[in-house]
Amino acid sequence: MQTSKLNDRLQLFASVGVLIGLALVAYEIRQNNELARADSVRVMLEGWQRIALSEYETDITVLHVKSIREPQNLTLEEVGKLSAWLTNVMNQYMLTFAMYDHGLGYSSGGIEYSPGDELAKSIDYYFGGRFGRSWYQENRYWIDAQIVEILDRELAARPIQSGDSYLENIKSRLGVEPVAR
């Protein structure tokens, strides 16, 4: 009888131990998921930061303006640099869309960011000029279908930015008075 009671108690303690262990494993998995989510968001934001910094640390800004104002005067080397820059931008958009598709969206202050909205807002900057649109048309075959759909819709509804109109649009959005000529 004594061994039967002892056996029952040991079995009960073992069962409780297993339940506690399972609870700890579930907690650890949840914690690891949150860490993975935070790391994914960090990687995404670092990618956008690298793109933004590259515009100021290299001659990309000058080339980008030249690609809008006088795309016919771009050299082969300049076309290569701009193409590499736009490829990085597009890869970053594809990473951002993939993260959102897998539930790894980014929110701040209760505001959920939509990659589609962000892409639509930045189309004039990256793809508003003749060079940007041409680059997109030549490279759309490897771009995610969801992004192609947004770009096609938005580009069809917007005029091609050229020369001063591009800079005037930016100035008007910033509230800067146009310069009299």
Model-inferred region functions:
Residues M1-Q2, L22, Q72:
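Generic secretory/membrane-interface signal
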Residues F13-V25:
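Hydrophobic membrane-insertion alpha-helices, especially the h-region
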